[in-house]
């Protein structure tokens, strides 16, 4: 989960572009409360690069916190921008 000024700053699109460039699979979506949620899967070094990127985000973002959890892989293919879930 990424907190701060992370919506309305092209966070999701930039995240997708970076993930595709890194060869990382997963997804990213806005949450109703203003945060962004993402899942990254791939080689550990590439996932680490994505998490490092999430701490900065795109130029207009102001990231205040990144919460990271290790979970069982879902064996995703590609990287998607998902719709915001209903509150």
Question: PLM features: what roles do these ranges have?
Answer:
Residues 1-87:
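Intrinsically disordered, low-complexity, mixed-charge
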């Amino acid at each position: 989960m990424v907190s701060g000024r992370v919506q309305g700053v092209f966070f999701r699109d930039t995240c997708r572009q970076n993930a595709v460039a890194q060869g990382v699979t997963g997804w990213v979506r806005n949450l109703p409360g203003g945060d962004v949620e993402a899942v990254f899967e791939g080689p550990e070094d590439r996932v680490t690069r994505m998490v490092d990127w999430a701490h900065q985000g795109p130029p207009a973002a102001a990231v205040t916190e990144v919460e990271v959890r290790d979970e069982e892989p879902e064996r995703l293919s590609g990287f998607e921008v998902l719709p915001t879930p209903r509150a």
